[in-house]
Amino acid sequence: MGIKFAHLADVHLGYEQFNRSQRAEEFAKAFEDAIKICVDEKVDFIVIAGDLFNSSRPSPGTIKTAVKILQIPRDNNIPVFAIEGNHDRTQRGPSILHLLEDLGLLYVLGVRDEKVENEYLTSEKTKAGWLVKGMYKDVEIHGMKYMSAAWFEGNIELFKSMFRPEGDAILVLHQGVREITENNYPNYSSELSLSDLPKGYLYYALGHIHKRFELTYDDAPVVYPGSLERWDFGDYSLKLTWNGFQFKEEVGVDKGFYIVEDFKPRFIRINARDFIDVHIKGHSENEIKKAVKLAVPKIPRNSYVRFNIRWKRPVDVDWIKSIVNAEYVRVNPIIIKEERGPDGKDLDVKKFFTELEWKIIELASEKEYEYYLNQIIDLLASEEGKVEAKIDAKREEKKFVRPKNPGDIMAWVKG
């Protein structure tokens, strides 16, 4: 009889997107819907590849929600294996996931100070500490929490030596793979290359990228299921781009997770809030209004919509909001300045900035930029040699130079 499991990631419980509690409820409902499908599908176990929570310090209400939902698989004898992502990990010591483990709701994979042995977990001594691995019949589930690019740069051989499967095994990580992010999602950070992944696994269950993606490495699936709900307007269900005459329509990716049977993934779509991203660059007020009116019939009543209006003058934000019948409407008026160089020709300001810098400038210049702070932080974090990574690297270097004892080496990796 074959193996059947579910692969979820980036649940982000507690995320009050745009400061709206409604969105936190919808993120929770998406998780509950996914878990109930897992039960109906009679999966053997569930893998959560990082960021179950949107914060390492979730509110009591968010913890209560997680407990309620995770009781569903427990009551159906379905073990849940999870790792910490960049949002819900701690620098050192136990995380909120370990509390859920103590409650018998899930099993945390990764490096720890102490050996763990129970029905679904086993431990292996490594140079980093005790590598706690999941077990289900003859299949092992390996994984570790999110680590910075600086950590991988200094410890790639250690990483590969830790993960050497001897039989059927799954590797669970919450990282950006460079070949995937650079070619498909340049706004996401990457910490390692595809070739850095240890070989020999039958399935690579990844998290961190919020749009689903599949490829093959070493004859095995490498899969990002994406987030269960739409994370921002870049993760749109529909993008409308005005070309001066009509809108070009671009359909986004569905949201959901994977059911994996005999290590072959099958995508399961779940209902998610529609996000409509409208881009209009106009040459007159009449053209702007014409484009907005043509966009209105394409916008579902229950959707979240963002209008990006580029024009040389301010636009009537209230007028746009008054004619758009949607659950949530944002208008980002972006004034196009006519910059000219010394020769009198139009000056392309963008050429003085990298793609990443320009993206941050655009986000920070928006009227309601505070809603984009998380995205701006994520973009800044993706910069090579980021401040936090340098601090982490210095900490690691100190630990390797003067460890108090062998068990203290890389102590902050341990959960």
Swiss-Prot record:
Textual note on the cofactor: Binds 2 manganese ions per subunit.
Principal EC category: hydrolase
UniProtKB keywords: DNA damage, DNA repair, Endonuclease, Exonuclease, Hydrolase, Manganese, Metal-binding, Nuclease
Amino acids binding Mn(2+) 2: 51, 86, 174, 208
Keyword Amino-acid biosynthesis: no
Active site per database record: 87 (proton donor)
Top-level taxon of the source organism: Archaea
Matching Gene3D superfamilies: 3.60.21.10, DNA double-strand break repair nuclease
Signal peptide: none
Binding site for Mn(2+) 1: 10, 12, 51, 210
Keyword DNA damage included in the entry's annotation: yes
GO MF terms, alphabetically ordered: 3'-5' exonuclease activity; DNA end binding; endonuclease activity; manganese ion binding; Y-form DNA binding
GO aspect biological process, one term: DNA double-strand break processing
EC number: 3.1.-.-
Activity regulation (record text): Nuclease activity is regulated by Rad50.
Pfam families, per database record: Metallophos, Mre11_2nd
Role description: Part of the Rad50/Mre11 complex, which is involved in the early steps of DNA double-strand break (DSB) repair. The complex may facilitate opening of the processed DNA ends to aid in the recruitment of HerA and NurA. Mre11 binds to DSB ends and has both double-stranded 3'-5' exonuclease activity and single-stranded endonuclease activity.
Subunit-structure text: Homodimer. Forms a heterotetramer composed of two Mre11 subunits and two Rad50 subunits.
Name the UniProt record assigns to this protein: DNA double-strand break repair protein Mre11
Higher taxonomy: Archaea, Methanobacteriati, Methanobacteriota, Thermococci, Thermococcales
